[in-house]
Structure formats: structure tokens, C-alpha cells
Amino acid sequence: MSTSHASAASARETTEGTVYTVTGGDWDEVVQSAAKSDDERIVVNMGPQHPSTHGVLRLILEIDGETVTEARCGIGYLHTGIEKNLEYRTWTQGTTFVTRMDYLTPFFNETAYCLAVEKLLGIENEIPDRASIIRVLLMELNRMSSHLVCIATGGMELGATTIMIYGFRDRELILDIYELITGLRMNHAYIRPGGLAQDLPPGAVDQIREFVKKMKKNLPEYDKLATGNPIFKARMQDVGYLDLAGCMALGATGPILRSAGLPHDLRKSQPYCGYETYDFDVPTADTCDSYGRFLIRLEEMRQSLRIVEQCLDRLAPGPVMVADKKIAWPAQLALGPDGLGNSLDHIKKIMGTSMEALIHHFKLVTEGFRVPPGQTYSAVESPKGELGVHAVSDGGTRPYRVHFRDPSFTNLQAMAAMCEGGQVADVIVAVASIDPVMGGVDR
């Protein structure tokens, strides 16, 4: 089988493009004729094991010299079957899975999932104020840690190693706070349906206040290193361009959408966890490029510091789990010295109170609570964009289906629009400005 120009092609090229006719022939002849073409385009694979692809992302690039003529993403190398696994676990056990999706934003994964479960249960208005405040506090700390990784790794890929060192230095302070509060640096499963696994430990508030002071002092350093560096600006300005029409067509959200000038933020448009009561701004840019997304992430960290301070001022003593004993675990299974849960005081209370309390606890932990049949969609504004959860219940103790709209997956579809027509070296900048995390993309 071969292709050739039709005799009538020349008359129709200007309006309908080139006309091809298909005639009989051998496939080997077609391949040989293509090889003899004067077109010197080649296809190269960037990844899936490449230091600049933010994980196991494979980019298939067709290049003509140094110009990218076609770009495609190859995903699925980090598929873990989290959505399928949720169908075989209780609603509470689901948090241990969802926290591992986008492993740089675990608290957003947990909150989005728990908000959906609470909506199905009809208890979204019964969550204690202290639990909601702590959720917001942890999410804003998480927003900063995610942006720090994005800025640090993006700078490293451009050769700005100082930004990388500063970014991971400041992120380490946030991970220390995570470890104090949840016992882990990542994969926390701290936010549960109905509230939290446990209250803040002693010293957590003071450590967070100390971090806020340090971060306010350190943030201007990023401005000096990046925005004051003409080489850094030249590498990012007008690179990875995607205007508002492109964002709307591709469903891009987060800093990508806000860099096109639209101040869309779910914390403002569809508030959750009491965000409507906090004072903060939604930064935007009109550059539609990688540099604008970088500036937005810097400003979002400043706004997160404002929200964290408001959270600390609002913290008042109170419960961190709903009062419904059919949902809340007795004593909330406080962490023990081993970090694995079941403190000795808790075990003593359950084992020594009554046989009925032990039976109730056993059934609640092993079988789980039942969720009324129905379906719902819940979304939060993660550092990458809109993180949505579509949860379906059939009335049992396990989810019938849970689907996640991960912003990294959606935003990554814009890669071709950003890169095609540009230079090979600019692909690195464009992908870094998208900030994809393959754990969330592949799930």
C-alpha cells in the first residue's frame, strides 16, 4: 500500500489541503520511500527514566533539528490501582490509600476524600471547628511544601542549584512539623472521615509559629535568586505558553489557569472547611507562560503564611472528631510511642471498661461504618489545581466506586500545546511549570 498525490491536488491545496490517493503496493516499499524522504525529523524518547521528567514520565518527541514538531506523553509507569483497591477497603481505610496518590500533597488527597465521604454521610455540618481549622492549617503548610519542591526541582533543571538547596532546606522544616503532628513525613492518613485521627501534640503550635517567622524571612531570597536573575527570567519568559482559551479547552486549573489571568480558586468560588472566613488573595498573572506560573507559586506561599497565622489564632480547645459513635472510633486510637497507634492508655480503657465497648470497637474497626447509598462530587484546590473526588456508595461498608480528578493528569494534557513549535530545551521548562506528580497521574 502506498500514497501519492492526486492529479487534482494542486487545485485544492489552498482550501482543503493536499489530497492523497491510496493505491495497491507493498508496505516495505512505503517504508523505504519514507526513509528516502528529505525530511530529517526524528523521534526521541525523553524518559521514563530521566532526571527532568518529575518521575517516570515518558515524553515522545518528534524533532526537526532543535524544534519540537510533535510531543506526546506516555503515562502509566507508576500505576498502583488505588481506585480499585478502595473498593475492597472500609471507608476509613481508604485514607491510607488516597494519601499515596500525589505523594507531595497527601493532606489534600485525604481532605478531598473525607469531604466526599462526609457529604454522603450527611455530616458535613457536624465536623468540629477545631478539626476544620487543623485541616486548613495542614493543607496550607502542604501547599507551601509542594510549591517549594516545584520551585526547587524546576530551578535545578535550569541549572539554578542554589534555588534547589534553599527550597529543600525550607521544605525540611515543614516535614519536621508533619512528623511531630502525624508521626510520619509523608503518607499520613491523619485526616479521617468525621475529623482527625488525633489532636495536635504539645509543642506543635509553637513549632509552626517559629516556622512562619523563618519562612517570612526566607521567601525574599527566592525573589533575589530568581526574579533578579536575567538568565533565569530569559529561560522561563515566553516558554510553555498557554492562553486562557487553551486552558479552558484543555480543562487546566491551578497556577496554569491563573497565569492566564483568570482568578479561579475553589477556596473562593466553592469554599470548604470554612475557607470563606479566611482573609487571603488569589494571585494571577497575564503572561500565560512558565515565568508567570513561577511568580504565582511564590505569591501563593505568602498567602498560605497569612492563612496559617489566622488558623493559629483561631485554634480553641475542643473535639477533633464527630460525636457520632457509629463513625468515630473510641478514643480515636491515639498514637502510641511506637508510632503505630493503640496507645497503652487507649488499650487499657477499651479492654477494661466493658465487653460491649470492646465488641463495638472491634466491629467498627474491622467491618467499618455503613454509608447511605448515593453519589457525590467533592473538590478542593490543591497546589496543582482542582482535585476532585467522585464517590459512589451502595449502602455498604466499602465504597462502590471512587474516582479522582487529579489536576496533574488533566494539566499534563497541555504539554503538547506548550511544547510543539518550541525548542527541545524548553520542554524541560514547560513540564516543570506544569509540576506533574506521576503518583497522582497514574494512581
UniProtKB/Swiss-Prot annotation:
Keyword terms of this UniProt record: Cell membrane, Membrane, NAD, Quinone, Translocase, Transport
Gene3D superfamilies: Cytochrome-c3 Hydrogenase, chain B
Subcellular locations according to the entry: Cell membrane
SUPFAM superfamilies: HydB/Nqo4-like
Disulfide pattern: none
Catalytic activity: a quinone + NADH + 5 H(+)(in) = a quinol + NAD(+) + 4 H(+)(out)
GO molecular function: NAD binding; NADH:ubiquinone reductase (non-electrogenic) activity; quinone binding
Annotated EC: 7.1.1.-
Pfam family, one: Complex1_49kDa
Uppermost EC category: translocase
Cellular component GO terms held in the UniProt record: plasma membrane
NCBIfam families: NuoD (TIGR01962), PRK06075.1 (NF004739)
Subunit structure of this chain's protein: NDH-1 is composed of 14 different subunits. Subunits NuoB, C, D, E, F, and G constitute the peripheral sector of the complex.
Free-text function comment from the UniProt entry: NDH-1 shuttles electrons from NADH, via FMN and iron-sulfur (Fe-S) centers, to quinones in the respiratory chain. The immediate electron acceptor for the enzyme in this species is believed to be a menaquinone. Couples the redox reaction to proton translocation (for every two electrons transferred, four hydrogen ions are translocated across the cytoplasmic membrane), and thus conserves the redox energy in a proton gradient.
Family listed: Belongs to the complex I 49 kDa subunit family.
Protein name: NADH-quinone oxidoreductase subunit D 1
